[in-house]
Amino acid sequence: GEYVRLHLDDRSTITTLFRLKNMEAALPSEMFMRVHRSYIVNLQRIRSYVKGRVFISDSEYVPIGENYREAFQRYIEAHYQNL
């Protein structure tokens, strides 16, 4: 198995024995998107997108994986004007 670490709004974390692929399938796709082989982001928490990075706060970001970049870019273009 694999461990998945969930980062919560209050900066706490929960670690669970779960495959990221299964977590991705369980989460609502209109709210979460896989952006890297190691990361799923809450789309409502995106602050900005700069040079292959999704910022979820002013200083915290996750990288966009090459295999996920095109789908993420399509999402951004469809949902955000000023991001």
What are these regions (language model features)?
Residues 67-83:
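Eukaryotic intrinsically disordered, low-complexity regulatory linkers and tails enriched in Ser/Thr/Pro
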